[in-house]
């Protein structure tokens, strides 16, 4: 211990030995009564190393000290965000696989849902982990400053793409209900992909000013060490263009679609003529019956049977609208708090408490991220095809098992037997009708003979003459 003391040092302690450079006292938990000596820097470092758990690190903004302060605590919010990230990535990968592998799901609406799942999956891969990292560092940006603008750009891009996809789905279904023939004729896979490309192009255009101006001026994307949009114009214009305007279009077209479906269903129930007219616009595959048989069936068909196909298609549309309505509702409910609070932070900048607004934004943004994880759960609960596909993919079965031959025979033989019995009954009825018709013919012949016997002989002679002439 002698090497730690200076030869001519006084025996009274100084403040430099027990006080940090910034003047704040630190409780080391050691009493230097024995000797009351002034320690050197080496002794100060030893005491600090033995008691570093008592450090407060106030005013210390260096990354090692900052990470030491926050990483030692149990961060339950970071754990919850990690669960959201895993659910988002895994669920949306299942949606992408289902639409890619299941032929039943390969239509325009599901292509939009697959593109929406891609946006949500990329949000879970590229945006959410960095946001979780900022939570671990006390909402301060731990990465290089140039990456802040890129991260905000990706966040706005994928969030805007989500609302744009839902808006496009709502518009596409409304057009399909209003003009089904034109929509079915021009709604090919290529056209669906062109619409998806247009959605992504609009989303990129809306979010592109963020990296353009943010990389030139850090003050637009940094505020007190936190990475966020600090420009009020960005916040206001971006909120309206990327959320509120598409939200208005989506809600209006969705309710117009519901109204049109209800109107068609009412027409199908009330007016038989309209049912017959609408039945020709059915998207279901036509049967292989000949035109003559279809004409004969249309003659003997009951009035209420004309609209069965149309009612079935309308029922399917209503079910699809129900599922999409749940997706729309959850998206709106989960993202509205963030955008409303974001606008309030700009409008009431002086009167609002910035700490409360910042805390609300940190919570509401993760509620919005949660909507990306909820969509696959909605598909699973309300769509049988998605549910069966997800269960097979989890079991590493990527192809649907075909029914064995026994099940095919069991399902087809009773139907064939029923049809054959119906044919036999029809033949018996036809034979009875033929027998009745022959009896009537015989009776008519007998009456004719009796009438001919009672007739005068001169008439018979004239008839014989006519027959001989023929």
From Swiss-Prot:
Localization (cell): Cell membrane; Cell projection, Dendrite; Cell projection, Axon; Cytoplasmic vesicle
Cytoplasmic side: 98-111, 172-191, 259-321, 382-470
An example Gene Ontology molecular-function term: Gq/11-coupled serotonin receptor activity
Residues the entry annotates as binding serotonin: 155, 342
PROSITE patterns, A to Z: G_PROTEIN_RECEP_F1_1, G_PROTEIN_RECEP_F1_2
Membrane-topology descriptor: Multi-pass membrane protein
Region called Disordered, residue ranges: 1-23
Disulfide bonds: 148-227, 348-352
Motif (NPxxY motif): 375-379
GO biological process, one term: positive regulation of phosphatidylinositol biosynthetic process
Swiss-Prot/TrEMBL domain comment: The PDZ domain-binding motif is involved in the interaction with PATJ, CASK, APBA1, DLG1 and DLG4.
Free-text function comment from the UniProt entry: G-protein coupled receptor for 5-hydroxytryptamine (serotonin). Also functions as a receptor for various drugs and psychoactive substances, including mescaline, psilocybin, 1-(2,5-dimethoxy-4-iodophenyl)-2-aminopropane (DOI) and lysergic acid diethylamide (LSD). Ligand binding causes a conformation change that triggers signaling via guanine nucleotide-binding proteins (G proteins) and modulates the activity of downstream effectors.
Subunit composition and interactions: Interacts (via C-terminus) with MPDZ and PATJ. May interact (via C-terminus) with MPP3, PRDX6, DLG4, DLG1, CASK, APBA1 and MAGI2. Interacts with GRM2 and DRD2; this may affect signaling.
UniProt name for this protein: 5-hydroxytryptamine receptor 2A
